[in-house]
A protein has these predicted regions:
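Bacterial Sec-dependent N-terminal signal peptides
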Residues: 1-32
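Catalytic loop of the DD-peptidase/beta-lactamase superfamily, centered on the K-T-G motif
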Residues: 22-89, 95-107, 236, 245-246, ...
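Short linear capping/connector segments at secondary-structure termini
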Residues: 38-43, 89, 150-159, 184-189, ...
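Residue-level signature of the cytosolic catalytic core of signaling kinases
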Residues: 47, 51, 67, 122, ...
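Short active-site loop at a secondary-structure junction
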Residues: 64-72, 93-170, 211-223, 317-320, ...
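Short, surface-exposed loop or secondary-structure junction motifs
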Residues: 80, 99-106, 164-383
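Conserved beta-strand positions that form and line the central face of beta-propeller blades
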Residues: 86, 117, 125, 152-156, ...
């Protein structure tokens, strides 16, 4: 039965029917040196090695995915890379306005620019995949006894109306606090990129009502993680960016990963700088990465391939705002989740356990831990994962605790090119 299914999958892939819908100076503390291993080509593996046939199929799959994927993807187990690919371009169409007027001649011109090609080291906005770093920072403070999961928001921000909401409820999206994406843009100071500090001020002044009683429901809301980033900065007495870099990224050996605020030169200063607008919009800003990151950072694109300008909300961190590449994400997964090098194992286990149990004792259909989602798949076991969508970026990060398998897609073109592909890869690997 498994052999038949294997042949059907291979036939499916081969048929072509694949609608795959610091700017600042680093401190004296050095990044850990981490080298990732690469698996040998399939034809060099012994015929008796069960990985040989799978590698051949994975290679074919990778080539077909590349027909539509604008981005990178990687398949790894522990610190060994099985397959990794980079496809497409940093920018498709330069013009962020006049979306109806872009032509494929423009795209062809961009394709001829060698410096415009995506590589495996290209940095992508992780969007909500960033949340696992915020959760890890919170858990690190808990492990260091500087914070408790039962601490209330009132302890840190007494002027904010959600005073009885706990750290755990923020981590698990059970706080009832409303989504800041939905606030009227007029509540912000729109002469600048909007920061976590400004968001906290807006919450204190506007006193928006809760959308449900804390603990009563699970609703994925980005405000929770933006608040957590502000709390990390306050408790650690360090900028959020610095705390994460020193305590998470350096021990993991993530030398390339940065925050949006570093990419565009907002960190550690210039946060009050006036920025030009796109089409007189309060929301979008006409700004590009600083020279240090030119040619290293992908720009997001909407479904019509038009360039997505930077949003003023980009500089709110915690819920998003991390830029990374596939190999740095493998280093992170190994250091934090697999080897427990960043936090004691007990805290890592808490992060990947379902934690969003409601006050009535019920578990929502969507299981959420600390910064990650989880699902029990009948054929593949428990997988830990998170997606990310933001201003033209579309990402998926998946990790399986039972064998250290990792599947990561990072894309800067929201054409759904890798939707559902993790399940197909798991089918190949588990046959």
């Amino acid at each position: 039965m498994k052999r038949t299914r294997y042949l059907l999958l291979l036939l499916f892939f081969c048929s072509g029917f694949l609608f795959v819908d610091c700017h600042n100076k680093l401190s004296a503390n050095k990044f850990k040196d981490v080298e990732l291993a690469h698996v040998l080509p399939a034809d060099s593996l012994p015929p008796s090695d069960p990985l040989r046939d799978k590698m051949d199929t994975l290679e074919k799959y990778a080539n077909l995915v590349g027909e539509r994927l604008n981005g990178t993807f990687i398949i790894a187990r522990h610190d060994t890379i099985w397959v990794e690919r980079a496809y497409g371009y940093l920018e498709l169409f330069k013009d962020p306005t006049g979306y109806g007027n872009v032509t494929y001649n423009d795209l062809a011109a961009r394709k001829r620019e060698e410096s415009n090609k995506i590589t495996l080291s290209t940095l992508f906005d992780l969007a909500s995949v960033s949340k696992q770093f915020t959760a890890a920072a919170v858990l690190k403070l808990c492990a260091d006894e500087k914070l408790k999961l039962t601490d209330s928001l009132y302890r840190f921000y007494p002027d904010i109306p959600y005073k009885n909401v706990t750290i755990k409820q923020l981590l698990t999206h059970t706080s009832g606090i409303p989504e800041y994406f939905n606030f009227d843009f007029g509540v912000y100071d729109t002469t600048m990129f909007i920061t976590n500090e400004q968001l906290m001020h807006v919450l204190a002044v506007q006193k928006f009502p809760v959308i449900f009683r804390r603990g009563a429901q699970f609703k994925y809301v980005n405000t929770n993680y933006a608040i957590l980033a502000a709390i990390v900065a306050k408790v650690s007495e360090m900028p959020f960016e610095e705390y994460v870099r020193e305590n998470l990224w350096k021990p993991a050996g993530m030398k390339d990963t940065r925050f949006f605020t570093e990419i565009v030169g907002l960190y550690p200063s210039e946060k009050s700088k006036d920025y030009p607008l796109v089409e007189k919009s309060l929301e979008y800003v006409d700004v590009t990465p600083v020279e240090e990151y030119a040619g290293k950072v992908a720009r997001g694109h909407w479904r019509n391939a038009a360039l997505a300008p930077y949003d003023r909300l980009n500089s709110i961190l915690g819920d998003k705002g991390v830029y990374s590449n596939v190999e740095d994400m493998v280093k992170w997964t190994n250091a934090f989740f697999i080897n427990a090098e960043i936090l004691p194992r007990e805290w890592v286990d808490k992060a990947i356990k379902c934690q969003n149990i409601l006050s009535n004792g019920k578990t929502p259909a969507e299981m959420y831990g600390y910064g990650v989602r989880m699902e029990e798949k009948p054929e593949h076991g428990k997988v830990i994962f998170h997606g990310g969508l933001w201003d033209g970026f579309h990402n998926v990060w998946l990790y399986r605790p039972s064998d250290g398998l990792q599947i990561i897609f990072l894309s800067n073109y929201y054409n759904r090119a890798h939707t559902g592909r993790c399940d197909q890869l798991l089918d190949i690997i588990d046959l």
